[in-house]
UniProtKB/Swiss-Prot annotation:
Name of protein: Piwi-like protein 2
Source species: Oncorhynchus mykiss (Rainbow trout)
GO molecular function terms attached to this record: metal ion binding; piRNA binding; RNA endonuclease activity
Subcellular location: Cytoplasm; Nucleus
Protein role: Endoribonuclease that plays a central role during spermatogenesis by repressing transposable elements and preventing their mobilization, which is essential for the germline integrity. Plays an essential role in meiotic differentiation of spermatocytes, germ cell differentiation and in self-renewal of spermatogonial stem cells. Acts via the piRNA metabolic process, which mediates the repression of transposable elements during meiosis by forming complexes composed of piRNAs and Piwi proteins and govern the methylation and subsequent repression of transposons.
EC number assigned by the record: 3.1.26.-
Originating gene: piwil2
Main location: cytoplasm
Amino acid sequence: MDPKKPCFPGLPGATRIPWLQQQAWGRGLRSDEPAIGRARGLMFATDGSASLGRARGFTTAGDTLLMQYGRGVPFPVSDPSIGFARGIPMPTSEDGGINRPRGWLLSTADPTVGVARGEPLLGLGPHLGQATPGQLAKQDLPEEMPSLQAEEEVVAKQVDMSTQGQGSSLVSMFRGMGIDPSKTWGRGGLPVGRGVFGAELQPQTAPVGAVAVAGPGGDRFPEDMMGQGNSFLGRGVPSQMVGMGRASMHPLGAGRGPTVPPTLPPSLHKEAHMTPGCSLTKGELKMEATCETLHKTGTKGTPLPIGSNHITIHCRNEAVYQYHVTFTPNVESMGMRFGMMKDHRPTTGEVVAFDGSILYLPVKMEEVVHLKSVRRTDNQEVDIKVQMTKILPPNSDLCIPFYNVVLRRVMKILGLKLVGRNHYDPKSAVILGKHRLQVWPGYSTCIKHTDGGLYLQVDVSHKVLRNDSVLDCMNVIYQQSRESFQDECTKELIGSIVITRYNNRTYRIDDIEWGKSPKDTFTMADGSTTTFVEYYSKNYGITIKEMDQPMLIHRPKERSKPGGKQVITGEILLLPELSFTTGIPDKMRKDFRAMKDLTMHINVSSEQHTHSLKQLLKNINTNPEAQTELARWGLEISQDILVTIGRILPLETICLQSVSFVTGADVSWSREVIRDASISCIPMNCWAIFYPRRCAEQAEELVSCFGKVAGPMGLRLDRPIRVELKDDRTETYVKSIHSQLTSEPNVQLVVCIMTGNRDDLYSAIKKLCCVQSPVPSQAINVRTISQPQKLRSVAQKILLQMNCKLGGELWTVNVPLKHLMVIGVDVHHDTSKKNRSVMGFVASLNSLLTRWYSRVTFQMPNEEIINGFRVCLLAALQKYYGVNHNFPEKIVVYRDGVSDGQLKTVELYEIPQLLKCFETFPNYEPKLAFIVVQKRVSTNLYSCSGDRFGTPPPGTVLDHTVTNREWVDFYLMAHHVRQGCGLPTRNISVYNTANLSPDHLQRLTFKMCHMYWNWPGTIRVPAPCKYAHKLAFLSGQYLHSEPAIQLADKLYFL
């Protein structure tokens, strides 16, 4: 790490990672005994001099209170300097020196704070964790960011001391849930976390002279000091205490929120907070504390009653009790552990959730309970120690996994069949005999803990199945192409998903085994051998009719148990006769009438959606067996869906060249854009149109219509160069276009009229015009322009699109932020190369947000997306400077294609690298807002009017109750819904130093949904995201390479 790197933008005196200022533990030694080099390396003199140990974990003498830094050691706060991480401190001046080998040195006039790997440490003294922001601002923290993987590994290693002491490698299936060692930064809201903090035993003071006790799993502490928390497992004796409990300790590590006021930008100082400390008496267990909510609610707009597909869950139990179970001598077998615990149900009760080491009960037992069992394999007596470690509130994140298990049992009781992750009702299937399909209605369910509490989220789901089995499909293929039967079957079936009706399980077809049949034998789990015919007859009562059919092969993904043992290996063979393909066939997708019949049953209205939800709730609440199952854990599900108050954002004003107007209730301005001039129109002086001979009439009519409708729209176009092709082969198009561009290099635009939906022809034209001979191109299907009554409307839309591709500007909305750059990013998977992905990047270049700069980067799975992101951002900033002669002061990034599980990666890795880009330009520190956009959400919103539910109007925003507790997020319904129910978009503010309040974020996002020029109305996502998606899709689906840089300042990909 280069010590000369500049400080973190906007954070005076601090470096890139403000959360490193929170208290944490490292790998050092105790503070109350003479310093001894116990870690790795040599000892240094303990005379209090400034020279210190250079490896990891060395101390100097001192009897003052110490704190550990990184992997280093505690140092007395009276020393002139402290070596951070692994370096050797050097003599320093008053303002502190720099540790040349690795790291920064901190001035010790300020309180020292542990900054190891982000794990909060309970106070080592009354004054710790109370440093003022002013004091912390003086410190120079390291710029190097800790690896996310490394942090997770540390947590995994330090989770359970007792189990490690026994040498067990088991990992709890609940371990790590809700436990987050890192801290968030730069969100622009109150940092708060999901960490489980709190109900641990009182940290015990380590007596002077105490030493670590060696055990099979490494150094550990005597029994009276042992905890199940992220302790100092074998890394030396801790300073003052040992953590009890499996999560970060109470209450300094509030999940992802700061425990010590970090050095924040001025805009964030108001929102930062500290979690108050609390003292515990020895042996006392307290209820896990609850987290404060983030400031995320806006005020702009008109209040509106909003319904959602969330159902309130009430917890009648006062608490859920967590116990740690220790087997002495150790029992490796998980099955044996479960069996032993089952023998003691009279003690633990019938309602348990046990994962092999952690036990959850709705009832409270003694703090420590000893049970006796006999291991049947060798008659060895086993002592089972059950020790209470935490008292959880019933709505704790740690309880949600087994609540979902309870919910799955309830759905089974109601007669619903589990297919994949959702539950369906085959008895209520809708048969579409004309199309040989059937639709199973069902539900997707999960229990979530949101800002409003514990909710059951239910969405209506449909499973489309074919009435014909895979064997029937094979017979049809055989009749059509006997010579290439096997090849055609492979093309048709490989990669498709099938369901086996006898067990309602789905499988992906990976291959076809032509050399095997149902008459072949296989070995069962017990070692016996049987044929497929006998197996299905004996186990399912199914008689196989076709004895010579081949077998379908499914290769399961490699999975392993927590202990690392493989679960499924080899291949699974399926019978085509018993397998039915799922999903909509490709041929049917292209059939408009068939899709119309199907969508009638799939795209249900808001009224039908809520009716289905209420029917499910009625079935649950009127079924005694289901109620009994829920009552075992004290759960009670409400009988109605959630209704709360949302807001409708103010309508926006659309600005054309000389006209501006407020959008209507349906947020559509298709009439205005064709009768008034666009902001900027590019004259089409030289353009060419290519068409096959049989489409000559349609081409002439289209050109004539262009001339009639262009005037009112402000467009001026000359007569085109007409090129009539002798046929419609791909080679004919490519050769003709290339020849024309060579002979006439000033061609502004290429228009191609094609017959049919031909991907090969479209791809060849786009490769030529986007990569080899860069020129904007427009592809038109002849069917689109074959209906005279619609030709005028079609011609107007095509002209608008052509104007965009040439660099024209259609409309804009008023965005009051000055010197703003808005960026859109999306990722698409390249179809030509397995696992290769392509990132589309689009950035605005002017204050009206009407000029755009675009780039594309490709990367393999082992490459980080940020590498290409950085290149694109630097190029966009340079282009922005070339247009405006200054850099943007605020940058707002809309990032699509990020799931919840990847949010931390974005926060901890992508954003710091983006901030590093700004250092390329001297004295440049822009404000940054990073917003993740999620389209695939299971939250539905409804407008409420009495007992009736409908579709919310465009501009509806909901920023509370159903939002996530960890992030500043909101749901936005920006588009007008004509069919189906309201599916909003979730927007998550991952980073915000741009002083953008929740109102600013929501209104800016809504404004950006008006800026997609391919549609005169609002769309679901901000326009930069949609542009980036179109660009990434074109590059990954058809180009398979980066487009020419000459087209980067045009929207050629629309």
